[in-house]
Amino acid sequence: MPSQPFQDDGVVLETARPKVKPPKRYQVVLLNDDFTPMDFVVDVLTRFFGMDEAKANAVMLAVHTKGKGTCGVYSREVAEMKVMQVNQYAREHQHPLQCEMEVV
């Protein structure tokens, strides 16, 4: 491809290079509450986020001690789906566990 702009009858055409930003990423977080059992939180982390038992326990303890814990970082659509799935699963099992997403 020539480095010179294309010229024809005094008209100069230049190739526009759009500035494309990478899409935003979202972290999915679980919020602590005083009623959801710790083993249910571990179940959620293994079931919906594919964590092994050790990682799920570490995140569960972060939720318990710090008030919230990060489950993963995803595109907007994936994060929205995971939040919806976790919140629905918690309600079906009559737990007040809350899951949210935050821009990274």
UniProtKB/Swiss-Prot annotation:
Superkingdom field: Bacteria
Pfam families the UniProt entry points to: ClpS
GO biological process: protein catabolic process; proteolysis
InterPro entries cross-referenced by the UniProt entry: ClpS, ClpS_core, Ribosomal_bL12_C/ClpS-like
Family of the protein in this entry: Belongs to the ClpS family.
Role: Involved in the modulation of the specificity of the ClpAP-mediated ATP-dependent protein degradation.
NCBIfam families assigned to the protein according to its UniProt record, in alphabetical order: PRK00033.1-5 (NF000672)
Quaternary structure annotation from Swiss-Prot or TrEMBL: Binds to the N-terminal domain of the chaperone ClpA.
Protein's UniProt name: ATP-dependent Clp protease adapter protein ClpS
Organism expressing this protein natively: Hydrogenovibrio crunogenus (strain DSM 25203 / XCL-2)
